[in-house]
A protein has these predicted regions:
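Surface-exposed loop/turn motifs in large extracellular/passenger domains
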Residues: 1-15, 21-40, 46-66, 70-93, ...
């Protein structure tokens, strides 16, 4: 699949995957969360790889956003670059990387304006690594506004980061040049 565009506007759904399911590679995903309600959002696919995954939260009721995909074989489900933008919106938990296996190479999270993160903020994935021992990755969290009610972690939850983690906090942390 070349490019997959998904927009949530005015409905309630359990899960959104930006990419493919159980086969193929999606080159680009763009998930836009405008209104409605969703439990889990994945920029990547289900058990598949995505080259560039982007999730933008602009007003939907969202429980958890993952920049990468869900599941995959030990090294399957690779997300090369993920970007999450939370713009003047509310999310419970945010993970820059994959969930439950697979690998994210590079993950960037941008929190802007009056955004509210009511739970945890992880630069990496949940039970999914950032990079590999032989191929380093990177997480970057940029916070230029908003409130994070719990903790901020540059790395992953119950997984490793092979590479670097960066957390930038302040008015100039997210600029027009930050990945979107």
């Amino acid at each position: 699949v070349g490019t997959a565009n998904v927009t949530l506007e005015g409905i309630t759904i359990n899960t959104i995957h930006g990419g493919s399911k159980d086969g193929g590679v999606t080159t680009n995903t763009n998930v836009m969360l405008k209104s409605g309600k969703v439990t889990n959002v994945y920029g990547g696919g289900l058990g598949t790889s995505t080259t560039i995954a982007k999730v933008t939260q602009e007003g939907a009721d969202v429980e958890t956003i993952y920049g990468g995909g869900y599941a995959g074989i030990e090294f399957g489900g690779i997300t090369t670059n993920s970007t999450i933008n939370v713009n003047n919106s509310k999310v419970e938990n945010v993970y820059g990387g994959n969930r439950d296996k697979g690998i994210t190479k590079n993950a960037t999270i941008n929190i802007r304006g009056t955004s509210l993160i009511t739970g945890e903020l992880y630069g990496g994935g949940k039970r999914a690594n950032i990079g590999r021992e032989s191929d380093a990755g990177k997480t970057t969290i940029n916070i230029s506004g908003g409130t994070i009610n719990k903790d901020i972690y540059g790395g992953s939850e119950i997984a490793a980061v092979y590479g670097t983690t960066n957390i930038n906090i302040g008015v100039e942390a997210v600029t027009d040049d930050s990945p979107e």
